[in-house]
């Protein structure tokens, strides 16, 4: 989906609009219900995430707590990502893997705020070693050929 910063009655919030683009390598069912199910699953595990504040099922929108700060990707680009971020990611993996889960480890999905690494997406999938942090995600959490290629492809080099 697409996420937008908006002003709620008590301050900033994030509004996520579900979208339905075709995806050749992944089959989605009901994306809104999947997002809600994943939120409940990850919340039950205790993953630090923004709270879900509201759901508009008719418009397929989620309203989430705003988590301030730069994403891990932005911190990688400026050289300001502290080592504790990757240590916290590995601690999250110790919660996820025994539960049979992976999340989207791409660094745009994480914000280090108040010393805590927050997963700002709600997506999770059944565990598959080829997509876990060590085999896939960590390739994008440092100055690697994969990250440089992604940045160039997205005009962020």
PLM segments and residue spans:
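C-lobe/activation-segment region of protein kinase-like
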Residues: 97-102, 112-157
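ATP-binding glycine-rich loop module of kinase domains
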Residues: 1-33
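Protein kinase-like catalytic core scaffold
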Residues: 13, 48, 62, 118-120
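Structural motif at the C-terminus of the N-lobe alphaC helix and the adjacent alphaC-beta4 loop
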Residues: 37-48
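Conserved structural core of kinase catalytic domains
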Residues: 28, 47-86
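Generic beta-strand structural signal
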Residues: 8, 55-57, 105, 112
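Conserved kinase catalytic-core segment
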Residues: 82-110, 115
């Amino acid at each position: 989906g697409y996420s937008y910063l908006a002003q709620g009655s008590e301050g900033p919030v994030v509004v996520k609009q579900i979208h339905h683009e075709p995806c050749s390598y992944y089959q989605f069912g009901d994306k809104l219900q999947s997002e809600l199910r994943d939120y409940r699953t990850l919340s039950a595990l205790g993953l630090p995430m923004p709270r879900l504040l509201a759901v508009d099922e008719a418009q397929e929108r989620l309203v989430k707590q705003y988590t301030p700060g730069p994403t891990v990707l932005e911190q990688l680009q400026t050289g300001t990502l502290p080592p504790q971020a990757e240590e916290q990611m590995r601690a999250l993996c110790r919660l996820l893997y025994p539960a049979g889960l992976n999340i989207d480890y791409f660094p745009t999905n994480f914000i280090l705020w108040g010393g805590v690494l927050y997963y700002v997406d709600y997506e999770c999938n059944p565990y598959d070693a080829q997509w876990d942090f060590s085999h896939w995600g960590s390739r994008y959490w440092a100055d690697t050929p994969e990250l440089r290629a992604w940045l160039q492809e997205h005009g962020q080099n």
